[in-house]
Each structure stands twice: as C-alpha cells, then as structure tokens.
Amino acid sequence: MASSSGDDFVILVCTNLNPIEVEVEKDREILISTDDIQSWDLVTILRYQTVRIRAYRNRLTEQSSYFHGLLGGSFSESSLDNIVVQWNLETFLNILQCIYGCPLNVALNNFLPLFEGALYFGVEMLLEKCRAWFSEVFLSKNSGPPQIQCDDLIHMWNFGLENANDFVPELCARYLARNFMWAMSNRDFVNIPFNLLFECVKHPCLTVDSEMHLSDALLVWLDANTEQMDCSIRTKENLTGILKEIRISILPLWFAAGKRRSCYFSKLADESVDSILRLVKIPPTGSINALGDVDLNHLRIRLTEYSEKVDFSSRPQVTSAILLLSVLHSSHSMDSTLRKIIKKYLINLEHPDKDHWRISECLPPALSFEALQEVNISKCHRLHLEYAIECFSRSFPSLKIIKAAYLLNIKTTSFIKLVHKCPLVSEVDLSVDISPIIPTQVSVLSSNPALPLVSNKCWDVTSCYHSGTSLSNITYLTIEGRTDICDSDLEFISKYCVSLGYLNIKGCIAVTDVGISNVICRCIELHSIVVCDTSFGMNSILALCCAAPKFGNSTGHFGKRASNLQKLHMGCCKGVDETSLIELMSQTAMLKSLCLSDTHLVDEALYNFSGSSLETLDVSNTMISGAALAHIIRGNSGLKHLHARGCKYLFQQGSYIGGTEFSFSHPCKDLFFELGRTCKLEGIALGWGFSNFSLEALKPAIISLKSIAVGLGGTLGEDALRLLPTTCPMLELVILHFQVLLINKRYFVDPYDFEPICKHIGRLFIAMGD
C-alpha cells in the first residue's frame, strides 16, 4: 500500500522466529505502537509469531542511517506503509527502545546482538552506548575475577574480525593480556584463536606472574592446537614463532634445562641456558655494562599497571641491576652515560659507608606499580636485599607479601627491619630447608617450669601502643629452619611485631622453651603456631594456658591464649609431658589444624579435646588407640586430612597411660566406621592395622580423596591399588612405605607393572624407608 503525503508513520512488520511457547491469540499477531514504547511488555510481545510496530518515520530516519536511506531515498520501500524487518525480534525491539530514548542496559548477554544490530541499522546512539560499556568493562582496573569469560571473549574477537571493526579486537587482545594468568587456567584457553593469542602476547599490558608461567601456557596451547590442525612444517614454524616473545634470559635455569626435549622449545631452551649461565658469570655490579650495546628489554622482569604478583624466585641471574632495569620506563635510552651511573650506583651499594643516595638522584625516576601486592625473591642469592627492599618501597607501594625463602646472606632481624620500609607488608616468608639439619630429637633447653616466664613482663607491650615507637604490621611470619634464630631474635620479633597472628619457627633448633613462651606471652593475637622440631615445652604450654591481658582502658583479661588457637603444630616436641598435653587439649576449642606427631600423646588427651572444627589432624608415631581416635573423629565431621602412620597401638583397646601398657586385643572397628560415616577426606596416611578391608569400610569417606599414604604395619595389595582410581576418582598421589608387593606371582620390580594405575593417578611413590 502506498503512503499518502499526510501520513508520518510506518508499520514495521517483524517475524518472531523463536516465539515463547505459550497460548496466544489465534491469529498469533499483535499490533503495538511506539507511542506506548515506555510501557512495552517485552515478555508478552515475544509470545507472538508476528509483531506489527507503528513507528514515526521522522524519528526512524533521524536516528538510523539504515531507515534514513530506506525511507528517505529512492528505494521502492520509501513509499510503502509496511516495511518488513528480518532481524531477531527481541534485539530489534531493544534497538527501537534506544531510538525512542528509553533506558537500555548493555550487558554481557546482549552486547554482541545489540552491537551487531546497531552496526546494521546505523544507530549511532546505540553504537556509542555499546562502545562505552565495552570500554568500561575491558579497561576497568577493578580487582577480582574477570567479568568476561574466555569463550565470550573468543566470540567477541571473531565478531570484531567478521565485521571489520578494529575497536573490538584491540580491546579483546588488551583484556586477554591483562588477565592472562586467569585465562591460562581456563579450560577454553586452548580454544583461543592464534591471532588473538599472538596479539595478546605482544601487547604491552601482558601481565604474568613470571616468564615461566607464560612459557608453560604457550606450550600447552601449542600442544593442543598443532596436533588438532595437522599443520604443515611452515605453519608450525609460524605458530612456534610466538615463543620468541618469551624473555628467555630470566627463566629459571632448571625450567629451561628441562624443556630441552620439547619439540617446540628445544632451540630456545638451549639459548636460555646459555644466556642464564652467561649472566651468572657476570659480577652483580657489572651486569649491564658487560652486555654491551644490545637491547636490554629481554632482561626486564615483566611488570604492568595490572600486576598483582611477581615471581622471580630460583633465578640466580637476577641482580639489583636487572631489578633496577625493570622498574625504569622502557623509553629511557640505555646510553653509555646512564650505564655508568647505574654501575656506580650498584658498586656503592656494596659499600654502605659511601653516599649512594646522591648518585641515586641522577637516576631516572622509577615507575610505581600500585596494584602489586606480592613479590617472591626466594633463592635469588645474588640480589642485593637492602636495595631490593628499597626498590619495593618506592615502586610497589601496595606490597603486602614478601617471600624471601632460602636466602642465607642476611639475618632474620635485619630483614624484618628492612621490611619496615614497606608499611603495608603483613606477610614475610624467610624459611630455609630444614631436612639436613633437624636432629632425630631436639634437645630441650630451659624447660623447667620453675624458670621465670615473661608473663610478668608482658605488660611492657602496653607502652608500645601508646608510645611513638614505630611497629611492624607483620601478622604472618615464617622463619622455618633458620638456625641463626636465637632467643634474643624472638624477643625482638615479639616486641617489634606485636600484631603477629601466625608464627612458623619449625626447625629453629637454637631457640629455647623460655624464648618461645615469651613470644606467646607478648603476641596476644597469635592464632597459629608451628613449632615442630623445636624446644617447645612446659613453659610454652603454661603460657598458652594462661589468660591473656587486655590493654588500653579495658579491664580484666581475655580468655586463655590456647582458646584462640586455630593452628597448632608441635610435632617432635618431646619436652611436653602427658599431663601438660591433656591440659592443653582441653583448652583448644577453636583448632582447625593440629599436629601432635612424635609426641607423648595419650588417649586421655584426645578424650579431653574440646574442639569440633578440626580439618587437619596428625597423630603419627604416637601411642594413641583406635577408640580414642574414633572419639575425636566423631566430634569433628569436617575433618579432611588425617595422618596416623606409625601408631603401633591404634588397634589395641588402649594406649600407654601412666606407664601401664594395655594388652593387645581385637582391632578397633569403630575407627574406620566413624571415618566412613562422618568424614569426607582429601588426604589420609595410615599404617598399623590398615588393609584392603579397611579401604572397603572407608569408601564413603574417600570419594574425594586426593592423596593416600600407607606405611609400616599396613598393607595395600595389587587388587586394592588397581581399584583406587575407581574408588577415589580425584586421587592424585599415592605413597607406599615398606610395602611388599607381589604381582603376577613375583615381587614387584618392574615399574611398567604400575603403568595402568599411573595413567589415572598423578604420582606414585614407593619408599623403602620412612
């Protein structure tokens, strides 16, 4: 029907290809008008097969280039009253709402349809709205999980390419680059198109914890895609070219050496090993000049405005020069003058008496990375720690966690003083390997209860709250295995780190029971203590069982310190007698993790345990009975990890109490019954009394099991091993101690016998000893 000159509206006829399946009018058609657009009920409208929309021509031609050309041009449709629109009905209704000024929310679920519709119909207002939403989401600096999922990102990238829109692909590459650590753990990571991945890796916003993470991710992608695509040799070379974006000079040496057999990475691995060894030979103060006039970008640790964590642990090639290079802007020309200034500055760092601050004023200003919260410099033995902390304080103002494990070139107390320059740091890890130095039994020093405790001095801490003394914010301190730690160091820690909540001094064999008790008394916020293989003894137990004082204007006392404990690991602490353990267990109602292995633990202590929140329990190599263990399991249904290897009395009626040994009797069936009835275990370690029949009773409890260890006195035969992957579908680790395995009528010696099992289990260890 032709339009008369007096008519200023047109009927838009839309066919709904996917109407909502409900009863509607027999003609399945509805007429609506843009006059009522504010009150449109889309749910009702979308039930109809055909929707006729009465819309004004002028508004359509003003806001849509498509309708401007169609209705205002020389097309035959321009004179018609009815125009057929073939488009997704819901999307088209949303486009009309935007044209007529109705509020419209762009979201992840409708962005692509709206953007595509806005492009097709030429609605600039909607295009701007889509661009604004896309930019806000993709450029947002908000922390937390990404709003866009990996598969959605892939769809958006493909859409941008198909519609020749550079705006979308560019932001997709940037978004993937800044969220690369999240993307690489996503199951859709291997489905990312090569061009998107390549643009992401080249993008200056590429954010990774380390080059090792980037390398692993790219190798996983290549493994998945080159096999599926059955690529030619030339195509494979193009694909592996992406690996050249990896900064191979700052990979860990062990990682690079381990990749020499990779079909994609072997050549780069050799180059990486050579480069690392060359860097290690260069003195720390001369690492920049010795490299000549080459581009130094490959030595920069990857830092961006989105970096939250950086890990350059186990890299002996990392020095102060490389750290300095990484926090300077890449636009700075590394000419001979700047190189000389850097060299002089680094040399002066080795001589504290020299005024290196005056030289530092000649250095270009360092960048600030506001989002970075965690740094790992463990095993970086050639890194000047004083400069490193100074650098962190300037360039990482939000730093909260410093991991500096396996570094022996600085005293613990000195490092804690240095960390004070980073005011927000709350967690410090200075642990070292303890296995070579822990004796079979730690000698207990000063464990006589008659010796004076610090409890009468703990009020001195009050002055710290009101004086001008500058205190550390450290709440989480790990100094495991530090043999340089003595009582005076613990006293410094207790005075300086008054907010300490977590303390790990495992293997600190030079500290005494009195020294440990002083820390417990002073640090009233302690909720987690790891004191395995130390002189933790009677004084420390007394300190835990004493009431903690209140400070400030408050009066009275807090509850006893033990009542606040959530984690207590005191394995191999022989200085605690049975009576003290019984008293301690009666006061630890909040415990979630408890380790009492190799202690004088007896049944009465477990019967006196007042808690119901245990998630981890280790009673290995103790004298407890199965009945006592069943009792504690019965009251702690949330138990996830149980270690009871080496408990010889586990299947007797009782244990050693007061020097009396109970005679052997029938096995305690209650234990496995309670485990199967009460718990959902993730890890278990058992020995004496454990058998294939025990595994059957445990079935309900081990559906989610991830690790199992069987020790001396227990048996786990071939049949049970073969059933493990079925019984425990999530199992990752199996450890067998002192197990005699008879397979095919011969003693097990051939590793290929276990090949079918290892296909389903991540790791299998067979230990001949403890």
Question: What name fits each language-model region?
Answer:
Residues 1-58, 90, 97-108:
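N-terminal BTB/POZ boundary and linker segment
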Residues 61-71:
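Short active-site loop/helix that positions an aromatic residue
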Residues 70-82:
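Cytochrome P450 substrate-recognition site 1
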Residues 154-207, 212, 219-225, 432, ...:
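Solenoidal tandem-repeat scaffolds enriched in leucines and small polar residues
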Residues 316-324, 334-335, 343-360, 381-387, ...:
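Short, solvent-exposed loop/turn at the beta-strand->alpha-helix junction
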Residues 322-331, 363-367, 389-395, 415-422, ...:
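A structural signal for leucine-rich repeat
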